[in-house]
């Protein structure tokens, strides 16, 4: 009679080994850290994004992808076997400027609005799959500010406009009573936004010699733009009509006097001629 064969412990041993292997892979993956840093750069300049893999195990390949609504888009890869491979869409626009498998950087030669967004760096690790990090690029345009004022018939307009990316905010300092404020914004195709704020002063004479400050809030900083109000020209419609009427009257009187004088001279000359003929 043959002795029985026990297979159950072997199954348990295989299961335990598999579990230990999975745990080891998970532990090694969990210990891998990807360090990234978001960047804010001036539009139409050079910008770089960097990823660092904190591990002693060197990955096989590094891939950079751009995050999009429809899914990530491959941009460029680097490996020791194939070097740098740039996708056709991104040729002449970007390159990997730090050739490494643990530290990698991509550089945009001349940033455009399409380059703004978030990017993933993927490290393909042997035995533990892919490890990724995300770095975001934000583009800005420095504000261009204009501050001026105009006098009208019965009020004064003080206008402050700022154009920038992202959109700036405008506030006023040094204003008094009897002043109305209106603000509007307009987006441009180049990615900038213009914000215009107008102060309407009902009694301009009260603001002569005073300093008005337009405060532009941009990226957490407040910049003051100052304007001193000089004496302007105030007039009303009745006063203007009176002045014009007076000028017209003076012109008519001058014409009438000139005509009378010229007529008297002609009469005098004709009477003298008749006396000589006699």
From Swiss-Prot:
Boundaries of every Ig-like V-type domain copy: 31-141
Tissue distribution: Found on the surface of neurons, thymocytes, B-cells and follicular dendritic cells.
One Pfam family recorded for the sequence: ig
Spans within the Cytoplasmic topological domain: 260-278
Extracellular side stretches: 31-232
Membrane disposition: Single-pass type I membrane protein
Cellular component terms (Gene Ontology): axon; cell body; cell surface; neuron projection; neuronal cell body; plasma membrane; postsynaptic density; presynaptic active zone
Disulfide links within the chain: 51-121, 118-136, 160-214
Localization annotation: Cell membrane
SUPFAM superfamilies linked to this entry: Immunoglobulin
Residue span(s) of domain Ig-like C2-type: 142-232
UniProt keywords, alphabetically: Cell membrane, Disulfide bond, Glycoprotein, Immunoglobulin domain, Membrane, Signal, Transmembrane, Transmembrane helix
Positions annotated with a glycan in the UniProt record: 95, 103, 110, 157, 181, 190
UniProt xrefs under Gene3D superfamilies: Immunoglobulins
Family annotation (InterPro entries): CD200_Ig_V_dom, Ig-like_dom, Ig-like_dom_sf, Ig-like_fold, Ig_sub, Ig_V-set, Immunoglobulin_dom, OX2G-like
Name by which UniProt lists this protein: OX-2 membrane glycoprotein
